[in-house]
From Swiss-Prot:
Keywords assigned by UniProt, alphabetized: Cytoplasm
Species, as recorded: Saccharomyces cerevisiae (strain ATCC 204508 / S288c)
Name of the protein in its database record: Uncharacterized protein YLR287C
Pfam families per the UniProt record, alphabetical: GCIP_N
PANTHER family per record: CYCLIN D1-BINDING PROTEIN 1, CYCLIN-D1-BINDING PROTEIN 1
Localization (cell): Cytoplasm
Signal peptide: none
Superkingdom as given in the UniProt entry: Eukaryota
Other facts: Present with 9100 molecules/cell in log phase SD medium.
Lineage: Eukaryota, Fungi, Dikarya, Ascomycota, Saccharomycotina
Length: 355
């Protein structure tokens, strides 16, 4: 805590500034629904919301770096005037950042998964700012337990990383963000196929739904807990036959997703405007497909002794239905692109042959 008269005035000014930021940015905005309530009449001349987002993320990141420097241990106590200036410089672009959001929310080219990512990154930034403000408020009140971290302000690092995420949103755009999501989807499909491969190499028949209830049963006799004998080799061959076929289906779906992902970031792909609803549908359906793939594999592994194809009949039917929905949406996106539409048609023929 500063001791001189001038320094004490700076302490008061800084505390007032911190309280003001708390009231302006941190109290009102704690969840995505709060951000959606922002009303703005922001009009951009000669620019776009995406370009402005990138500029503001860069400016915020630069001011965040300066704040980290002037607030580090050993520097903060003698630098309150500079700290006030840097925090003010940070709060101005933050205000403009939030005023941009209605332009994204009301834009028919911005799918929900994209604005969800914006919300997540912005709330991370505000969470970091919330921690930072709380740390400085405690420090100014001379709380004996307060500290600014031994090495650096962790909260400043959170803000810095959130600025990077916002910048990534602006650079990638809706199509690039979806491409990033699909990259993870493809990796999960690889994991699923590896899981199948590992099970076939080292089959485990110990899993059984009856095991869940064993601890609750009285052990009155050996026969009560005995399991039905089964032909392990026959069961294994049945599961192997199913898994071999199912792996081919996963590979084909992976081909669809990975090819579509490459299209999204391809320079020769020029989608029409107002495709947010189509992109959201594709995103949703592909998530459903991944869940169904995992559900089928889990069903087989959960009770392998009693497995029959009938056990996953509903899941496979649902998989076919949702995949056809994806193809319809992809075809919409490929309107005016006969080469890619033809590829979709060819893929669907092969898909129908497997199912």
């Amino acid at each position: 805590m500063s001791t001189g008269s001038s320094d004490r005035k700076d302490d008061v000014k800084l505390l007032e500034l911190l309280n003001s930021i708390d009231e302006q940015f941190l109290v009102p905005y704690k969840k995505p629904e709060d951000l959606r309530k922002i009303s703005s009449t922001t009009k951009l001349q000669g620019s776009t919301p995406t370009k402005e987002l990138d500029k503001l993320a860069s400016v915020l990141k630069a001011h965040c770096t300066k704040i980290g420097i002037v607030c580090k241990p050993g520097t903060f106590d003698n630098n309150h005037k500079v700290v006030i200036t840097e925090i003010q410089n940070f709060s101005r672009p933050l205000f403009y950042l939030l005023s941009l959001f209605p332009l994204f929310y009301n834009n028919k080219d911005c799918p929900k998964y994209f604005t969800d990512q914006l919300d997540e990154s912005t709330l991370q930034l505000l969470d970091g700012l919330r921690d930072f403000i709380a740390e400085l408020q405690e420090r100014l009140k001379n709380d004996e337990n307060a500290s600014l971290d031994k090495e650096r302000l962790t909260s400043v690092g959170k803000i810095f990383n959130a600025c990077d995420s916002l910048s990534n949103c602006s650079k990638a755009g809706p199509y690039g963000i979806l491409a990033n999501i699909l990259k993870d989807n493809v990796a999960i499909m690889d994991d699923t196929m590896n899981e199948i491969k590992e099970w076939l190499e080292e089959p485990d028949f110990s899993a059984n739904s009856d095991d869940i209830f064993l601890d609750f049963e009285d052990s009155e006799s050996e026969s009560d807990s005995q399991k039905e004998e089964f032909d392990q080799e026959k069961v294994y061959e049945n599961i192997k036959l199913f898994f071999d076929g199912f792996t081919r289906k996963i590979k084909l779906i992976k081909l669809l997703v990975s090819t579509f992902r490459k299209t999204l970031v391809s320079k020769d792909f020029t989608p029409k405007r107002n495709q947010a609803e189509t992109l959201d549908s594709i995103h949703t359906y592909l998530k459903e497909i991944q869940l169904l793939l995992d559900e089928v594999v889990s069903t087989v592994q959960f009770e392998p002794k009693n497995f029959t194809n009938e056990e996953v009949k509903e899941e496979q039917a649902a998989l076919v239905a949702v995949t056809k929905k994806v193809l319809i949406q992809m075809s919409k996106l490929y309107e005016g692109d006969p080469k890619r539409k033809k590829w979709i048609d060819t893929w669907e023929i092969k898909f129908n042959e497997l199912f």
